[in-house]
Amino acid sequence: KDVLTTPFVVINADDYYGKEGFREIHDYLVKGGQSCMAGFVLKNTLSDNGGVTRGICKMDEYNNLTEIVETSNIVKNAEGAEADGVKLDTESLVSMNMWGLAPEFLKTLESGFQYFFEKVVPENLIKAEFLIPTFIGELLAEGRISVKVLRTNDTWYGMTYKEDVVAVKDSFREMLEKGIYREELFADL
């Protein structure tokens, strides 16, 4: 909390998010925005190798997040995607845990973590997890935070199944060939 003095991004370290989400979050935060998240298009986050869980975003008419609906067992099909037999709109925006936050959020996070550590952990010592999306969802429900959803059309890559490794490697090779990334990532710094 003493190091983060400017707006920042929180991501999962083992996922690939693309460039657009970072750019959108950066632009929003440097213009004075406080809290935002990258909303990935559902079809750009699915695995060819099995079902996945995604947080489908509900928003108001101004693209403010109102709720994240955790939806399990989402699979691709001929029409797009479904979860347990229910057709899903593949253009829906989903949370892939890419948050843009202001330093002031750290105080709220700290008090939430303290409550979690004192009240939740003792009841479930082995499996208790403090999840930022869950915490932000609670803050939304209490009206204590407003989160702008910023659409990104980039493809998200994760390693949900071991079979995903080949597809992810092929995608990165293709990005190198197209010049999206350089072989030496930091050569231009």
Residue ranges, per PLM feature:
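A C-terminal functional module that forms or caps the active site or interfaces directly
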Residues: 110-145
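Conserved core of the sugar-phosphate nucleotidyltransferase
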Residues: 18-99, 103
